[in-house]
Structures are given as C-alpha cells and as structure tokens.
Amino acid sequence: MELLHSINDFNEAKQVIAGGVNSPVRAFKSVKGTPPFILKGKGAYLYDVDNNHYIDFVQSWGPLIFGHADEEIEENIINVLKKGTSFGTPTELETTLAKEIISCYEGLDKVRLVSSGTEATMSAIRLARAYSQKDDLIKFEGCYHGHSDSLLVKAGSGCATFGSPSSLGVPNDFSKHTLVARYNDLNSTEECFKKGDVGCVIIEPIAGNMGLVPAQKEFLLGLKALCEKYQAVLILDEVMSGFRASLSGSQEFYGVVPDLVTFGKVIGAGLPLACFGGRAEIMDLLSPIGGVYQAGTLSGNPLAVCAGLSALYKIKRDKTLYTRLNALAVRLAQGLKKSAQSYNIALETLNRGSMFGFFFNENAVRDFDDALKSDTEMFAKFHQKMLFKGVYLACSSFETGFICEPMTEEMIDLAVAKADESFDEIIKGV
C-alpha cells in the first residue's frame, strides 16, 4: 500500500490550513504517520486518493451508525436540499426531530438544537449555572466535553494525545470555577463538592475520549445522589454514547435520569447537529422565555435535521439493530484480545453497544490515570500496521472505535486476522 498522493495532499494542506487539518487528531501525530486523504466512503469502507480502501472503524468519529453514504438518508437529504439549505426560521422538521429524541430518553421534556457538541455542553453548563445560581463546575479527568475554555482542564482525547493537561490561551480566570475529580471515584468527587460552591456536574457516562472507559454503575448512581445532596445540576454528556450505545444511550446500562443531557453525532448522521435538553423548569430559562441567552445562525438547519431524523427513523424501525451491532463489537473485542494473548501482548478490550475500545495495558482501565499507563508506542506500531493492511482505526489510543450497520462477521474476522498478522510482525520486528 502506498500513500504518495496523500503525502502530497498533506504537504499542500499544511501550507494553507493550520497544521494541515481542521481537527488536531486527524494529523496522525500520535501514531507518527501521514493521514490518508479520503475520496469517498460507502457502507463500512473508506476509499482514499491513492486507490486504497479500508474497513472503517472510525465512522467519522461516531455519527455514521448506518455507515457511509446510506441510500435512504442520502435520498432524504437531497429532497430537502432541493427546497433550500437554510432559512433561519422555524421548520416543522425541527419539531419532529425534537419529539423523536425526547421519546427515547427518560426525564427529557424539551430540547434545543445546536450545531456541535461543544455548543451543546457549553450551553447546558450556562443553563445549569443559571438554574442553580452557583458558579462552580465539577468535571472528570479524561472526559472531553468540547473545546470551550472552561472545559479544557485535564480533558481527554487530544489533550491526552499531545501530553498537555489543558490548552494555551485559556486565562486562569476561565478555569478557576472548574473543579476536576477522578472518574469512577466518589470520594474524589465529594471532596470537590466540599471545596466549592458547585452548581453543576458534567460527565460522560460512557467516556470515549480517554479510550472507552464506562462509568461503574454504583459510581454513577452515587454521583446522582451527591448532586441531589448538594443541590447541583447533573449533566450527562451523551454526545458520543447517545443513540450509539443503545437507543436510550447510557440509560439502558445505568438507569440514571439526569437534569440535563447533551446529544450529538448520531442525531446528525454525519451533518453538523447536536442538542441539549432536560426538565422543562430548567429549559424554560432559555431565551426567549427566560434570561439565559443561546443562539445559532445554522441551529436546526433543515439538511442536518433531515439527516438526523432519517437516521432515527431507521434506528427505530430496526428492532434488532443494537443487538447485532453489540454482537459484532464483542466479536471484534474478543478477537483482538485473543490474538494479542497468543503473542504475550498485554491488551485490554471492551465495548458498550456499538462502541469499542482497547488499551495496550496489563490491567483493566477504570480512570484517566489507568489510561495514561497504556503503551502508546505499541499502539502507534499497531495502528500503522493495520492501516497498511486496510483496517482504519482511530489514530489515537485515547479514542473510541465504532461498529456500523453494514459491517459483517466476515469483515470483523478479517480485521482480527489482520491484527494477528500485525502482532506477528511487531514481535518479529518486521
């Protein structure tokens, strides 16, 4: 496999785009490689400008639960496109999508559509602070909630990949109200409550940006109890896990009803769309009813709303979708672990629904510190081997992988076979 055209494209991109990419992880810096420049996607596959194709376990970082270029979703988008791209006015589609989202999640009375996960979490926190009338926020090490200033404190994903606990350019005053607790640790969390005047807590119930690290059930239930004890608003960030782990996101696994929740990725089916929502008494503080301002020129634009609505309709029609996707994710996780064990390579694997993760680590990973103990050099070698064998994995050991509906057992078994070849070559130093 060659990437000559991609190498040239990347060099050209770096002349006019900062870093050559529009999101840092895409640069392949942590795996010491060159990103393939993608020409098209179809189903479970990506096709690059060098005529290579890959089984895609990234799926645009999660949104494409039905894979690339799904015909039904595409057709619906095209029909809406013919009527216009954006109006800046209310549309019936927005109301329909809101109803569909609300019907899937307990405790959700109203939502507000936005264009990105960052907007959703930023707006939810502003709203929670207004409702609680308290400024301090608790987040958790390794959880990523977008790139708004107050949340870039010990975030996962890119910050972990590049060895930075936060970001330059964020004034101390922006983060002084952000308290950071250890994931899956109630004692650490209550210490944060005692330190400040905490108005809200935000957490990924199924963390996907320090690798895949699900919350322990007793921890999440305990966190809900702490929020009630200290009268703080609980925000579940389900931008990644919502409609991915299950139809009801994390609620199927934990049964926790938050005060506010954020969704993204799947609800836009690959177009820019996210939302936040919760109890009516909180949501009604938003302008134009209340005094909490939030707005967006393209919020609820018809193309993204149509894409998301089409995806949700398909999900609800397919009663065995999540069962099948989970089975494939389990097959992949178990296959990778068995292959690694045969070469005496330490590898921890797990999945939640169609989300999967793996760590080159001797022990199970339950928090950010555990994740940071993983062998990132081994991951980089493995990633490069798999890429050149036609398997496209997330280009950071602190990211999550995804299964899509067009994938088959044969594709999973092929990926495991390529992993076996890769481990063999790594051990032999080839």
Curated annotation (Swiss-Prot):
Keywords: Cytoplasm, Isomerase, Porphyrin biosynthesis, Pyridoxal phosphate. The modification N6-(pyridoxal phosphate)lysine is found at K265. InterPro entries: 4pyrrol_synth_GluAld_NH2Trfase, Aminotrans_3, Aminotrans_3_PPA_site, PyrdxlP-dep_Trfase, PyrdxlP-dep_Trfase_major, PyrdxlP-dep_Trfase_small. It comes from the Bacteria. Its EC number is 5.4.3.8. It holds the Pfam family Aminotran_3. Its cofactor is pyridoxal 5'-phosphate. Belongs to the class-III pyridoxal-phosphate-dependent aminotransferase family. HemL subfamily. This is Glutamate-1-semialdehyde 2,1-aminomutase. It comes from Helicobacter pylori (strain Shi470).
